[in-house]
Amino acid sequence: EEKAAPEPPANPRPEPFIPRNFRFSTDYDLYPGGAKTKYKNNILAIKTLKQIEAEQRTATSEEQITLARYVGWGGLANAFSDKAAGWESEYQELKALLTEEEYKAAMRSTITAYYTEPELIRYMYRALERFGFEGGPDRRILDPGMGTGNFYSVLPEQYQGTKLYGVELDSITGRIAKQLYPEADISVMGYEAVKFEDNSFDVILGNIPFNSVKIYDRRY
């Protein structure tokens, strides 16, 4: 007499969730619409980030798509003005959502926070390939002003496994970057405050903000 197959467990243990770095896809429609759409995407991303942090967990792949739609506040100065016609509700919503420190940082970023298009980033990686950079687990790449990490969203396949590092001054932006790239080593602080050893990176690339502000660096 044949034995019956064993019954599967009533509540099989779910597969453990392993956080992975976000990968850009045109299917996600990350950068649609005008100023109001960008504002709404930013707000949803911030609310998602704060919920994730309150629950002390890592973003799911679906939440990463929401977070990746955060484009910062460049060109959205109206959201920070109580006198901008048509932006009254957005102004109130933003004041209520952000802490005082987050709000001030976001308002300051309206003239500097413009993120780099993925296609432009791909051209920069092609230049790296022509220079002979091969990547690998013993190689290190740094983005010193990474924003939410667009440069790592289109990292070429041959560079997967390369150690990734990033620095971002803005708190909200840097915390989103950490959720999007949990496999990277990201510091949320001013670049002058990060303690990297000299000559410790194989590649430094990015599109950092340009300004005439002088920064104090205790080492120099």
Residue map of PLM features:
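Class I S-adenosyl-L-methionine-dependent methyltransferase catalytic core
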Residues: 1-220
